[in-house]
């Protein structure tokens, strides 16, 4: 979804109109019945646009059934596993090129790939990131950014700054997904559930 920023909308102060990049349908993101609300620990956000809805939720939203979306088509297994393999390789490649990440690379890398433990954790948590791949422009880069953010936050012994780390935290929805991945990752590490 992209915000409609036409001169007419700006003149009348309408900043809640969005247009789907794929089907070109319009969405009024005002917390009403059209919004698909996602409850996070910090706030309530519209899943379609990523806008924070706290304090802007219309009462009619709670009177009917909660809207939800389903997958339109099945996931291609070969593409899914190919993407996982690329993700694991790219995570290590990115970390090897950054300064101050030697300790992290030693913890998670095995050659050009990740260790078996890290591989199992990524396999288990990747399902959380599927919505990002389907609806965001540059979805793969966002997913890489999420995993890099999670890995650096868990394995780093000092502060690491990189633009790739902050790409996933600009949008509340993607930040929420990254937090779910991190929570699941930490649970799997603490319970040795890999």
From Swiss-Prot:
The subcellular location is: Host nucleus; Host cytoplasm
Q: What is its main location?
A: host cell
The record, for InterPro entries, names: Herpes_UL92 (IPR004289)
Signal peptide position in this chain?
1-25
Any one GO CC term of this protein is:
host cell nucleus
Alphabetically sorted, this entry's keywords are: Host cytoplasm, Host nucleus, Signal
Report if keyword Protease is assigned. Answer: no
Signal is among the record's keywords: yes
**Pfam families named in the record:** Herpes_UL92 (PF03048)
Q: How does it assemble?
A: Interacts with ORF34.
Q: Which family does it belong to?
A: Belongs to the herpesviridae UL92 family.
> What function is annotated for this protein?
Plays an important role in the expression of late genes. May play a role in viral replication.
What name is this protein filed under? Protein ORF31
Query: What organism does this protein naturally occur in?
Result: Human herpesvirus 8 type P (isolate GK18) (HHV-8)
**Gene behind this chain?**
ORF31
């Amino acid at each position: 979804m992209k915000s409609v920023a036409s001169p007419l909308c700006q003149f009348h102060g309408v900043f809640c109109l969005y247009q789907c990049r794929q089907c070109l349908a319009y969405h009024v993101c005002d917390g009403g019945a059209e919004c698909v609300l996602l409850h996070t620990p910090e706030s309530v956000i519209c899943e379609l646009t990523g806008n924070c809805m706290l304090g802007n939720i219309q009462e009619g939203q709670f009177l009917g059934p909660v809207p939800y979306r389903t997958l339109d088509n099945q996931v291609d297994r070969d593409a899914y596993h190919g993407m996982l393999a690329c993700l694991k390789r790219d995570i290590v490649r990115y970390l090897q090129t950054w300064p101050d990440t030697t300790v992290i690379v030693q913890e998670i890398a095995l050659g050009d790939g990740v260790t078996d433990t890290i591989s199992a954790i990524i396999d288990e948590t990747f399902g959380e990131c599927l919505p990002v791949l389907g609806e965001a422009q540059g979805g793969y880069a966002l997913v890489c950014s999420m995993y890099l953010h999670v890995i650096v936050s868990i394995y780093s012994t000092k502060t690491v700054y990189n633009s790739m780390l902050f790409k996933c935290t600009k949008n509340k929805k993607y930040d929420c997904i990254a937090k779910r991945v991190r929570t699941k990752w930490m649970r799997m590490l603490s319970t040795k559930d890999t």
